[in-house]
Regions:
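N-terminal cationic and glycine-rich segments that engage phosphates or anionic surfaces
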Residues: 130-139, 393, 409-411, 422, ...
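Inter-lobe coupling/hinge segments of SF2-like helicase ATPases
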Residues: 275-278, 286-607, 671
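Accessory helical-bundle/CTD segments and flexible terminal tails appended to RecA-like ATPase motors
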Residues: 513, 532-542, 549-556, 561-564, ...
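OB-fold nucleic-acid-binding modules
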Residues: 38-69
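Upstream accessory/linker segments immediately N-terminal to the RecA-like ATPase cores of bacterial MutS
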Residues: 74-264
Length: 698
């Protein structure tokens, strides 16, 4: 048997150099192996032949057997189309094509018997099937073969006659060459224990299943394997890291922590905060490097927990550092932490790109001597000139905004890697967290401090703008501030949505007595900061902005968030924007403004937003609606999880199950030396070579 991974796809029957080039560029298919692992996205049952008299326009797909009675062309220019009148003796349907008219008239013969497959629609009382699949009836076995696979293709592929049907034919050719079993990629013990189909059977049946039951078994086998190796990679990496990096032992909770707890704590900790703090304290004293992800909705008190963790580092003679993605957020953390530590003998400094000259020199010197105990900053803290006396704990806010390499540079700031606490206000569904941040232990703050009023979310149509502005005026008259967010900076030729510039002028006219500031992504940082400062200080009553305000603005007096063209935003983005209000004691409102015409999934998104403020429920729904590759931040996380068949949203239970299976193997075989696991470690090594990011997790 030849090696599928090295056999060039151009040598497969029906491919050749030209088609191979298209497959290379469009789908990343270079070898026989790549094609074999290009799975169908759906299957259509072609086991039944319908009679024309049975069909109506509401049926999804149908298959007919009959003959072409004749052809005619209709329309002019771009509307020109070929119509074939097709009959099986019980009625007539019109087969319609808008392209390739000459070719089709030459290809199909009148009064010859064909199998036709497609989606019926009704137009002017007649049944039509546009661009159907047609095969000569003599090839009935090829067409009516039960479940037919459908493969995703691109426009460029279709222009090269590489549609789903063409890929299916290539796959038949490839599967026909598998005359002996492929090398197994799971151990005999795993196959037996979990009742998994052998690899060769699974691959043949995923492309050409003999029935629904066999298809389910093939899918299960391939999903199990895919998710299993993702988890085995993450868990093996975590185990190796624990062995390699011992981590500082923070033995005590001392005077600094206790003094803060008894005198400076602004309010009683919630039960969730207490639980998370216990988890962190346990990690810090365990003698292994902490690598923990702290999730919590906006306003849940993550910063307070992070500060108390840093105070434990100080009590044990170490320094702590907090890294934020923007200057505004770093400034905000600095002000908050200084306020919380008021009256305590703790030196806190802020280091951003704006800090220069003698001030910067004094901070760098203080870090080297250990006088600066807590440093808060942006990516400026990872510059080569920044060195610590004894960095023991690093807190990273908004993890997904830092690349793997940036985070790794923090490790070089200490004799051995410091403890790492990653904070995010972007709720990550449990299943996605296991894949994206699987080597991090996860803590969740899932309750808000007492006294916070839930934000009221309302969906309003564009036409109700008069009543909307009346409500805004009432809030401003009561001394509150308002955000108005737009999805685009300037008008697009293709999409006519409200843009920020127009919106800004309109709001200035509508509220002439108010100061309106404007913030968008194309501004210079200094200009943006100046505009934001107008709003933070209360000088401006209204901020008109794009989504740059998702992270980093804390204005307790802002009580209204209006999101224009809310249909243009994803669920997680809407939730993050909503989190800019509801930070004070007053009732806050989030108003989602849309047009009347909404797609079904958009309607669902808006209904979820109106129904719940729970970030984790929203994140799970977003994952189901959009898929993991679209979720904010995941593409920048530095982790490849380009799953070919498994679905993080739908296969959450299986992911949990295979994680436990992988954990058992890593625990029993930490050195990868047991003979029964040889296949698994060999396959993992091969996957790490082909998936470049697998070696650089979190």
């Amino acid at each position: 048997m030849f090696d599928l991974t090295t056999r060039d796809i151009k040598y497969l029957s029906g491919v050749g150099p030209q088609r191979a080039s298209v497959l290379n560029k469009e789908l990343g298919i270079f070898s026989f192996h790549d094609l074999l692992y290009y799975f169908p996205y759906k299957y259509v049952d072609r086991s039944r032949i319908y009679r024309i008299r049975e069909i109506d326009g509401a049926m999804p797909y149908i298959q007919l057997k009959g003959e072409i009675l004749g052809f005619e062309t209709a329309g002019e220019g771009r509307q020109r189309r070929l119509i074939a009148h097709f009959s099986d003796g019980t009625g007539i349907v019109d087969l319609i094509w808008f392209q390739g008219i000459k070719y089709l008239i030459g290809k199909y013969k009148v009064h010859q018997e064909y199998i036709v497959f497609g989606k019926p629609t009704v137009f002017n009382g007649r049944i039509n099937i546009a661009h159907p699949d047609i095969d000569p009836a003599s090839e009935l076995k090829l067409s009516a073969m039960g479940l037919q696979p459908y493969y995703n293709t691109t426009e460029k592929m279709k222009r090269s006659s590489l549609n789903s049907h063409a890929i299916e034919k290539m796959m038949k050719s490839l599967v026909g060459q598998l005359n002996e079993p492929l090398p197994e990629t799971l151990s005999p013990a795993l196959l037996a224990e979990h009742h998994l189909m052998p690899l060769t059977d699974a691959l043949m049946n995923i492309h050409f299943p003999s029935g629904p039951d066999v298809l389910r078994k093939a899918e299960y086998r391939l999903k199990f394997e895919e998710l299993f190796y993702v988890q085995l990679n993450i868990l093996r990496y975590a185990k190796d890291r624990q062995r390699k990096y011992r981590g500082y032992v923070f033995e005590k909770v001392g005077d600094i922590f206790n003094g803060f707890y008894s005198r400076n704590l602004p309010f009683e900790l919630t039960n969730a905060q207490k639980r998370v703090l216990k988890e962190i304290r346990r990690d810090l004293g365990a003698g292994r490097q902490m690598n923990r992800l702290l999730q919590g909705d906006v306003g849940s008190g993550k910063t307070l927990v992070a500060l108390m963790s840093m105070l434990i580092a100080l009590d044990n003679g170490y320094q702590a550092c907090m890294m934020a993605p923007t200057e505004i957020l770093a400034n905000q953390h600095y002000e908050t932490i200084r306020e919380l530590l008021y009256g305590m003998d703790v030196r806190v400094e802020l280091l951003t790109g704006s800090v220069k000259g003698k001030r910067r020199e004094a901070i760098l010197s203080g870090l080297l001597t250990g006088d600066v105990q807590i440093l808060i900053g942006t990516h400026a803290v990872i510059e080569d000139t920044v060195n610590f006396a004894s960095l023991g704990l690093v807190v990273i806010d908004e993890q997904h905004r830092f690349g793997v390499a940036q985070r790794a540079r923090l490790w070089t700031k200490s004799v051995q890697p410091p403890h790492i606490l990653v904070m995010t206000a972007t709720p990550i569904p449990r299943t996605l967290a296991m894949t994206l941040y699987g080597d991090l232990d996860v803590s969740v703050i899932d309750e808000l401090p007492p006294g916070r009023k839930p934000i009221a979310t309302i969906h309003q149509f564009d036409s109700h703008r008069v009543s909307l502005y009346r409500s805004v005026r009432k809030q401003i008259d009561e001394g509150r501030q308002v955000y108005i967010v737009y999805p685009l900076i300037k008008e697009s030729e293709k999409i006519d949505f409200k843009n920020l510039e127009e919106g800004y002028l309109h709001i200035c006219e509508e509220f002439p007595d108010c100061r309106v500031c404007k913030v968008h992504g194309k501004m210079k940082p200094a200009e943006k900061d100046a505009q934001m400062q107008l709003f933070v200080s209360g000088e401006a009553q209204i901020m008109v902005a794009t989504t740059v305000i998702e992270v980093g603005v804390n204005v307790p007096n802002a009580s209204v968030m209006i999101i224009e063209n809310a249909e243009r935003f994803g669920l997680s983005q809407l939730h993050q924007l909503r989190g800019r209000v509801g930070r004070g004691a007053d009732q806050s409102y989030c108003i989602l403004v849309t047009g009347y015409k909404l797609a079904e999934d958009t309607r669902k998104r808006l209904e979820i937003m109106v129904r719940t403020n729970d970030g984790f429920e929203i994140a799970e729904a977003d994952l189901k609606l959009r898929g993991p590759g679209d979720l904010e931040g995941t593409q920048q996380s530095g982790i490849a999880f380009d799953l070919k068949i498994a679905d993080i949203a739908r296969d959450g239970q299986l992911l949990q199950y295979v994680r436990e299976v992988a954990q058992t193997i890593v625990d029993k075989d930490p050195n990868g030396s047991l003979p029964e696991n040889e296949i698994l470690w060999r396959q993992l090594k091969a996957l790490r070579k082909t998936n470049v990011n697998w070696a650089a997790i979190s």
